[in-house]
Regions:
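N-terminal module-boundary/linker segments of secreted carbohydrate-active enzymes
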Residues: 23-102
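N-terminal Sec signal peptide cleavage junction
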Residues: 18-20
Length: 253
């Protein structure tokens, strides 16, 4: 009887060991698959994709903060959207930059920006410092994904730079038209203008809860904020300092 119990216990123990080994093997296989998927996203630079720290380490972080000329593929995404037929800026004056950023949950995302070549190096340095500090930026994909519709892009809290367009309500070209201005977390840092009739225009429209800068909320840019400090240190001006309007999302050179 004792011998039979010993045999049964031995069998049960062996089964537990096998199950544990299978679970570990499945876990390792899942991690390998996840890393391969991340590396594929990194190779293709699928902006907006969440990737792991391990994948970044394997891929190489220096490859994740890069300035490139506008390729045919990128220009194809932009043409007749952010880069309109009457655009006064040459394709050669623009640059495509790859960056990493984190959201409010600490996830790492692939980001992309089209900017003027004269601020490309500034942006690479700034965004790398923001990434190292885990500064939250929710989304950073080309505005062309929103058909260059500024309202839609801002409403999605998408940070963007180049877009050939006029200043809201005017016939003057925006600094965005040359890729010399960038908007960061625009939903939570809206454009606010008091009209002659006394009403207040807010862009994006759904950003109105964040027009009151006395409130505390995530993604808010203010003067003690790291994002503000870095852009100012690199010679940018902040729209939140303007007197006639307030553009809290906006930094320009």
């Amino acid at each position: 009887m004792v011998f039979l119990r010993f045999i049964l216990l031995s069998i049960l123990f062996s089964l537990c060991i096998c199950a544990s080994a299978d679970n570990n093997s499945n876990y390792q296989n899942d991690k390998i698959t996840e890393t391969k998927s991340d590396i594929s996203a990194l190779d293709k630079w699928e902006a907006g994709t969440i990737v792991s720290e391990k994948s970044i380490e394997k891929y190489g972080i220096d490859r994740c903060f890069v300035i490139e000329k506008i390729s045919d593929a990128i220009f194809g995404r932009m043409y007749n959207k952010s880069y309109k037929g009457n655009c006064s800026v040459s394709r050669g004056e623009l640059r495509y930059i790859k960056i990493l950023h984190r959201n409010i949950n600490g996830d790492i995302l692939l980001g992309e920006i089209v900017c003027n070549k004269h601020i490309a190096k500034d942006l690479i340095v700034i965004f790398r410092e923001l990434y190292n500090a885990s500064y939250p930026i929710e989304r950073m994909i080309l505005i062309d994904n929103y058909d260059a519709d500024d309202e839609r892009s801002m409403s999605a809290n998408n940070s963007s730079c180049f877009n050939f367009r006029f200043v809201a309500g005017t016939k003057s070209l925006s600094k965005h038209s040359r890729g010399m201005a960038i908007d960061i977390n625009p939903l939570y840092n809206p454009y606010v203008k008091r009209t002659q009739s006394g009403s207040i225009d807010i862009s994006p429209r759904i950003g109105s809860p964040y027009a009151n800068r006395n409130k505390s909320f995530n993604y808010k840019i203010e003067k003690n904020d790291l994002c503000y400090k870095l852009f100012i240190a690199h010679g940018f001006k902040w729209g939140g300092d303007w007197s006639t309007v307030k553009d809290y999302q906006h930094f320009e050179k």
